[in-house]
Amino acid sequence: MKKFLFLLLACAAVAFAAETNAPVEQEAINVWIKAFSVLAAGLGLGVAALGGAIGMGNTAAATIAGTARNPGLGPKLMTTMFIALAMIEAQVIYALVIALIALYANPFIVLQ
């Protein structure tokens, strides 16, 4: 896994560090940057959604278990659960915003 990660970072470093004046080469570099941007956006959003789903599931399970043990605390636990779910969902939305920036407002793409 470390070798694959090192290879991916090395390829990304070459794509980002290369500087040229030839329009054909610059277009090829832009294609690589776009490809890596799509890969990063997809992986980042997928990991964020997976983590958010696991966190939301654990939060709901803990709230249901707490309400089953002490039904009088149900409304208070629900309020706390909704606040926690909003915070978890905010992290996924932040990942979505970063993915959209990487896809549509990429600062590494050189316009000609």
Curated annotation (Swiss-Prot):
Annotated organism of origin: Campylobacter jejuni subsp. doylei (strain ATCC BAA-1458 / RM4099 / 269.97)
Cited function: F(1)F(0) ATP synthase produces ATP from ADP in the presence of a proton or sodium gradient. F-type ATPases consist of two structural domains, F(1) containing the extramembraneous catalytic core and F(0) containing the membrane proton channel, linked together by a central stalk and a peripheral stalk. During catalysis, ATP synthesis in the catalytic domain of F(1) is coupled via a rotary mechanism of the central stalk subunits to proton translocation. Key component of the F(0) channel; it plays a direct role in translocation across the membrane. A homomeric c-ring of between 10-14 subunits forms the central stalk rotor element with the F(1) delta and epsilon subunits.
Gene from which the chain derives: atpE
GO cellular component assignments: plasma membrane; proton-transporting ATP synthase complex; proton-transporting two-sector ATPase complex, proton-transporting domain
Pfam families according to UniProt: ATP-synt_C (PF00137)
Site (Reversibly protonated during proton transport): 89
Keyword set, alphabetical order: ATP synthesis, Cell inner membrane, Cell membrane, CF(0), Hydrogen ion transport, Ion transport, Lipid-binding, Membrane, Transmembrane, Transmembrane helix, Transport
Coarse class of the protein's main subcellular location: membrane
InterPro entries: ATP_synth_csu_bac/chlpt (IPR005953), ATP_synth_F0_csu (IPR000454), ATP_synth_F0_csu_DDCD_BS (IPR020537), ATP_synth_F0_csu_sf (IPR038662), ATPase_proteolipid_c-like_dom (IPR002379), F/V-ATP_Csub_sf (IPR035921)
Entry protein name: ATP synthase subunit c
Domain of life the protein comes from: Bacteria
Localisation: Cell inner membrane
Membrane topology category: Multi-pass membrane protein
Subunit details: F-type ATPases have 2 components, F(1) - the catalytic core - and F(0) - the membrane proton channel. F(1) has five subunits: alpha(3), beta(3), gamma(1), delta(1), epsilon(1). F(0) has three main subunits: a(1), b(2) and c(10-14). The alpha and beta chains form an alternating ring which encloses part of the gamma chain. F(1) is attached to F(0) by a central stalk formed by the gamma and epsilon chains, while a peripheral stalk is formed by the delta and b chains.
Entries under Gene3D superfamilies matching the protein: F1F0 ATP synthase subunit C
A Gene Ontology molecular function term of the record: lipid binding
Assigned protein family: Belongs to the ATPase C chain family.
Bilayer-spanning residue ranges: 36-56, 81-101
